[in-house]
């Protein structure tokens, strides 16, 4: 697995691998969906009251609002 230092911040996440490789703390969103926040290996949304894995998240292309914890 890659470390945060080896990853560059993409503008969008599209594939299951994109979501899997996003570091914890990343926040993504798209026009018709609330923001999703990555904690560990899961993505959660307070507004959508849901949890998704990387495969579930890859059903939509989302814009990266924050990469990791923003460090």
In which residue ranges do the predicted regions lie?
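Structural boundary micro-motifs
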Residues: 1-71
């Amino acid at each position: 697995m890659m470390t945060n230092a080896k990853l560059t911040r993409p503008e969008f996440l599209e594939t299951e691998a994109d979501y899997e490789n996003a570091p914890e703390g990343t926040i993504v969103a798209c026009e018709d969906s609330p923001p999703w926040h990555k904690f560990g290996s899961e993505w959660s949304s307070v507004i959508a009251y849901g949890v998704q894995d990387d495969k579930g998240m890859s059903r939509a292309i989302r814009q990266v609002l924050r990469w990791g914890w923003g460090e």
